């Protein structure tokens, strides 16, 4: 008799995706982040659901409802901080996942890569709207500043911003719609993640060497299921250390002050995971130019496959490209630091140089160095 997991219509899908899936025998821990992102998403949906049971999306009561969750709801504080810090874990995994893709040439699977970019943008939108919900000072002013960027769009900008706000400023209507979108988007992310996997399983996983591994596959279960569980436990450990020992480490103290449209905080800045993009935005003195640079800083990922000039897929055997990659990582860390600093000398200049370097590495240096490596190898 055939095993039920191979015949049952539903079990068959799970079997072919997580059990009998042929996987490369040499994928490293860098391949763990896909499953970790799945775990993050599930944690965020569950904690978010329980928070939504007690949260009110009204400007007069939103801040108090979050306080009520932390003080009066059974284990509300841990649910709230798991959700807030879970977002940080989500972005850590996202950045490492994208970094892995850049390093090992995973972008050579165009459908998987492009859906990944859409996922990244959707998660960023979700996180931004979630940050507005507690209705603290940074929530309100963050929402005001970021939505205002759309007014840089010629001709329709102002109308567009007022349409998104649902009025002439960030107010009750804005908060309500942001809550609605923040609730629905994770389920859209879930669907996109399923499509992401669907396309990945059409080609099979890449591996560190970048060489096709069809001649050497192993079953996903038990080898990679146990590896993924270990990764998930380590991530859960890190998350709970953050939640239980320093839950506000990554947050902004200004968000413990209720939103006040009449008083602007001295330094408006987003959560840490947006700082690199915020630094690029601020480094251009023109509003529209800054918005375009901000957009392009993420959308540049979509043209990475077109800029691949190397004869090899992975950077495993390309030391010069590796130097460029780690220079890019260092540059992103500098941008993240600059995004959290006030707009004054010397931070302005550092931010501008780091922004120029970011685009130069991706658009010019990496493709050029790949060609040099091809020539050195006489390929």
Swiss-Prot record:
One of its GO terms (biological process) is mitochondrial electron transport, ubiquinol to cytochrome c. Its cofactor is heme b. The keyword Nucleus does not apply. Heme b b562 binds at residues 83, 182. It is found in: Mitochondrion inner membrane. A ubiquinone binds at residue 201. The keyword Lipid biosynthesis does not apply. InterPro entries: Cyt_b/b6_C, Cyt_b/b6_C_sf, Cyt_b/b6_N, Cytb/b6-like_sf, Cytochrome_b, Cytochrome_b_C_euk/bac, Cytochrome_b_N_euk/bac, Di-haem_cyt_TM. It comes from the Eukaryota. Keywords: Electron transport, Heme, Iron, Membrane, Metal-binding, Mitochondrion, Mitochondrion inner membrane, Respiratory chain, Transmembrane, Transmembrane helix, Transport, Ubiquinone. Coiled coil: none annotated. It is a multi-pass membrane protein. Component of the ubiquinol-cytochrome c reductase complex (complex III or cytochrome b-c1 complex) that is part of the mitochondrial respiratory chain. The b-c1 complex mediates electron transfer from ubiquinol to cytochrome c. Contributes to the generation of a proton gradient across the mitochondrial membrane that is then used for ATP synthesis. This is Cytochrome b. The gene is MT-CYB.
């Amino acid at each position: 008799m055939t095993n039920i997991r191979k015949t049952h219509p539903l079990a068959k899908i799970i079997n072919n995706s997580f059990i009998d899936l042929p996987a490369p025998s040499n994928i490293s821990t860098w391949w763990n982040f896909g499953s970790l992102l799945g775990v993050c998403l599930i944690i965020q949906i569950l904690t978010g659901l329980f928070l939504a049971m007690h949260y009110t999306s009204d400007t007069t009561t939103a801040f108090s409802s979050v306080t009520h969750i932390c003080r009066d709801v059974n284990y509300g504080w841990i649910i709230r901080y798991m959700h807030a810090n879970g977002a940080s874990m989500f972005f850590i995994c996202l950045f490492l996942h994208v970094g892995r893709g850049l390093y090992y040439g995973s972008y050579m699977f165009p459908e998987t890569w492009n859906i990944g970019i859409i996922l990244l943008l959707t998660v960023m939108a979700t996180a931004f709207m979630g940050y507005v919900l507690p209705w603290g000072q940074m929530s309100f002013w963050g929402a005001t500043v970021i939505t205002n960027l759309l007014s840089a769009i010629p001709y329709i900008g102002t109308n567009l911003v007022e349409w998104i706000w649902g009025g002439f400023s960030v107010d009750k209507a804005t908060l309500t719609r942001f809550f609605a979108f923040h609730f629905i988007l994770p389920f859209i992310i879930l669907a996109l993640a399923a499509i992401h996997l669907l396309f990945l399983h059409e080609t099979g996983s890449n591996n560190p060497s970048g060489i096709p591994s069809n001649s050497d596959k192993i079953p996903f279960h038990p080898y990679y299921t146990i590896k993924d569980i270990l990764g998930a436990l380590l991530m859960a450990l890190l998350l709970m250390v953050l939640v239980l020992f320093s839950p506000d480490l990554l947050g902004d103290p200004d968000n413990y002050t209720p939103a006040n449209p009449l008083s602007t905080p001295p330094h408006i800045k987003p959560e840490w995971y947006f700082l690199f993009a915020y630094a690029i935005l601020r480094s251009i003195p023109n509003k529209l130019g800054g918005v375009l640079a901000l957009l392009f800083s993420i959308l540049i990922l979509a043209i990475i496959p077109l800029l691949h000039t190397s004869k090899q897929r992975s950077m495993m055997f390309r030391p010069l490209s590796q130097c460029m990659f780690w220079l890019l990582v260092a540059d992103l860390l500098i941008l993240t630091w600059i995004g959290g600093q006030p707009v004054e000398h010397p931070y302005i200049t550092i931010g501008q140089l780091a922004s120029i370097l970011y685009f130069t590495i991706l658009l010019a240096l990496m493709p050029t160095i790949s060609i040099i490596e091809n020539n050195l190898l006489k390929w």
